[in-house]
């Protein structure tokens, strides 16, 4: 005959397995709602412009080379092959001031920015002696700026030269589909002092702004009103300052660090913008309640297990029996906490939603247990204990770097409490089936383990 303790533990483990079903459904709901938010970001990007990645400015020198080849009949055929030579700047300085605004669509929101980017660029005198051949025709060079999304171009000033040059749409290079270019002349490039130019590009975008540091020496300065930037990328800023009013950051890099010049060393280089290193600043939400809710749900099974353990100890130490249905109802209330948290966080923010959900579920469980455990004080103690656990969970969620330390300390404290309460308990007596069927003499109370002994 199996002991009572065996069947009790087996039942509790079975109930915890059952609770895995709504927990899995909760994770699915969180993924679904997070997907809705991402679709909103996509809709805003489609109606304005997406994340911007700026490549340039650089100078492109097109030239046509005539090659004589024999065809199948042995006749000489002249083929004209189009080539491009790329000239990278000696120095590149960009000063940007994007202003961020929050755009809402329903209950979701995303960040869009718009602001000027002031470019100052210097090119050295190029070596073009190898193009002075009879079979080579050099075309008109042009200055090129490539973008991820040309819809974000709000305005562009003329290229600052002794004689200003207006920009034209398009890149003129097949591998770079979106951008602008300004026509130049070979005489401009062959000056001993090189080519110095400046211009201002007013650009709009969403989510992030990146600049590929093409110059032998490159520098980017950004100043914005968004107080929650993310600088993760190929290069961290050398200087940064983040306040409640916004942020400022400065990046510097050279060819020694980024080796970008090697990507343009040969003519007709295939330019893959996404693979080139870049200075990047992203606009992030101060609190991602979907991510926090997902992390909270990962602790759900632990919370349910701790609550069931508390019930089990209460049964063992007091002799008052708790039915498995009562375990199941309390477990359902614990799972409902996370659904309430997710639903309210979309409207009230994570902190207020967490407070409301924890008070509501703790109060509901406390009210129910005051009847199930035959004592208002017992129900209040369980509710207070749950509130304490929810408080610890909130600290775990807010302090991701210290979550492991806090979690280990919590588990140690719980284990120590269990060992302290059960240090004098005779588990063989608890496991004895006769303990539930023996009769107690009239007028004599059944001996029980007392917490205060």
List PLM regions with ranges.
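Generic detector of multi-pass transmembrane helix bundles and their immediately adjacent loops
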Residues: 301-453
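Soluble non-transmembrane domains of integral membrane proteins
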Residues: 35, 39, 46, 60, ...
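Glycine- and acidic
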Residues: 23-27, 286-296, 395, 399
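Cytosolic-side membrane-insertion boundary helix
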Residues: 275-304, 323-324
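Alpha-helical transmembrane signal-anchor/signal-peptide segments
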Residues: 26-50
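Hydrophobic alpha-helical transmembrane signal-anchor segments
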Residues: 2-28
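Cytosol/matrix-facing amphipathic helices and coiled-coil assembly/linker segments
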Residues: 20, 41-43, 53, 279-285
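Short extracytoplasmic
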Residues: 45-70
């Amino acid at each position: 005959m199996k002991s009572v303790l065996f069947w009790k533990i087996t039942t509790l483990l079975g109930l915890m397995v059952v609770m895995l079903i709504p927990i899995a459904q909760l994770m699915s709901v969180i993924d679904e709602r997070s997907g809705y938010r991402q679709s909103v970001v996509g809709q805003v990007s489609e109606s304005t412009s997406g994340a911007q990645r700026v490549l340039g400015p650089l100078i492109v020198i097109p030239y046509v080379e005539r090659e004589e080849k024999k065809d199948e009949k042995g006749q000489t055929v002249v083929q004209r092959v189009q080539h491009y030579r790329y000239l990278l700047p000696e120095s590149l300085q960009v000063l940007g001031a994007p202003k961020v605004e929050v755009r809402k669509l329903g209950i979701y929101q995303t960040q869009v920015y718009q602001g000027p980017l002031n470019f100052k660029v210097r090119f050295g005198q190029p070596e073009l002696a190898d193009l002075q051949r009879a079979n080579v025709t050099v075309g008109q060079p042009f200055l090129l700026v490539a973008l991820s999304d040309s819809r974000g171009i709000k305005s562009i000033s003329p290229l600052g030269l002794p004689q200003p040059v207006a920009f034209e749409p398009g890149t003129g290079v097949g591998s770079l589909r979106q951008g602008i270019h300004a026509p130049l002349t070979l005489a401009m490039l062959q000056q001993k002092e090189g080519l110095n130019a400046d211009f201002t590009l007013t650009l709009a975008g969403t989510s992030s702004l990146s600049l590929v540091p093409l110059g032998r020496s490159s520098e980017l300065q950004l100043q914005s009103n968004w107080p929650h930037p993310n600088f993760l990328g190929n290069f961290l800023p050398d200087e940064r300052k983040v306040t409640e009013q916004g942020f400022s950051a400065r990046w510097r890099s050279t060819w020694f660090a980024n080796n970008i010049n090697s990507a343009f060393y040969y003519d007709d280089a295939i330019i893959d913008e996404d693979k080139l290193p870049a200075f990047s600043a992203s606009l992030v939400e101060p609190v991602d309640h979907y991510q926090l809710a997902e992390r909270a749900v990962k602790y759900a099974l632990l919370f349910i297990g701790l609550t069931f353990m508390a019930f089990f100890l209460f049964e063992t130490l007091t002799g008052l029996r708790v039915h498995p249905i009562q375990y199941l109802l309390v477990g359902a209330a614990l799972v409902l906490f996370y659904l309430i948290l997710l639903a309210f966080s979309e409207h009230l923010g994570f902190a207020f939603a967490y407070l409301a959900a924890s008070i509501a579920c703790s109060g509901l469980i406390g009210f129910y247990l005051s009847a199930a455990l035959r004592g208002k004080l017992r129900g209040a103690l369980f509710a207070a204990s749950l509130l304490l656990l929810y408080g610890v969970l909130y600290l775990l969620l807010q302090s991701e770097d210290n979550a492991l330390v806090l979690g280990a300390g919590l588990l140690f404290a719980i284990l120590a409490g269990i060992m302290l309460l059960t240090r004098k308990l005779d588990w063989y007596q608890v496991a004895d089936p006769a303990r539930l069927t023996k009769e107690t003499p009239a007028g004599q109370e059944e001996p029980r383990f007392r917490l205060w002994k």
